Amino acid sequence: MTRYHYLGYRPLPGAQIRYMVKDEGTLLAALGFGAAAWKVAARDSFIGWTPDQRATRLHLVVNNARFLVLPWIHIPNLASRILGLAARQVYHDWPELYGYQPVVLETYIEKKRFAGTCYKAANWIHVGQTTGRGKLDRHHRRNTPVKDVYLYPLHRHFRRVLTSEGTV
């Protein structure tokens, strides 16, 4: 990640899981999943939850924080195939590690760099854009690139799970 991903390597906050994708011993790709962003208008509107619901259930949303297919790997449809496999693997592995089942994956695609084609091909849902203010904004000014927001439901009734008033 440090060498080939445009964001480099940074430790992920909170709960996290990383995958290395290999074929017959050859490294093809790497993915990192971690804690979801606290407040994203496009995602929050799509889910339809209240601030209180978000505060108690945000842990059920997992962020695909990094995805890198190594630059010399050229296999048609590989990226979307990996995303599909990774979603199933996260759904299986996350409860083993953290004791709860995530219901949605999220990711953010920098619009000026990428079209999000592999996410679209893997059936992720484009739900809007970020404002470009970043997670540490205190002055309500754009200081990071605007990104497309994509979600991938892991549970058929993810909205019901995330917005229910009872226990999950």
Please identify what each model-predicted range represents:
Residues 158-168:
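Flexible, glycine-/basic-rich loop-and-beta segments that form/coincide
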Residues 2-158:
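Acyl-donor binding region in acyl/amide transferases
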